[in-house]
Amino acid sequence: MKYYLIAGEASGDLHASNLMKALKREDPDADFRYFGGDLMAACGGTLVKHYRDMAYMGFIPVLMNLDKVLSNMRLCKQDIAAWRPDVVILVDYPGFNLKIAKYVKTHLNIPVYYYI
């Protein structure tokens, strides 16, 4: 199966990497593509965007980087649509991930799971 995961911070990277290891045990042919970090990258697959390029805490930093936030959102939507995974797994990071969930369910009809 093709799995698309999104973890936008260090704790999500940890949980997603553990999930990836478990999925690989059950599905040795698992193919991963993700927004995440170094722990996920160590599990294999394709890192599309590192979380350190996405994480902005607080209202002012988000506003100051709104163009980057929106660009990351567009990149993520386009990448999911182009890769056509069997499932999308979202790990925490609700401000970003819930918008992606709505897009995927509405436009792509791919199953979405929110993990943690």
Region locations from a protein language model:
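Active-site and donor-binding regions of nucleotide-sugar-utilizing enzymes
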Residues: 2-116
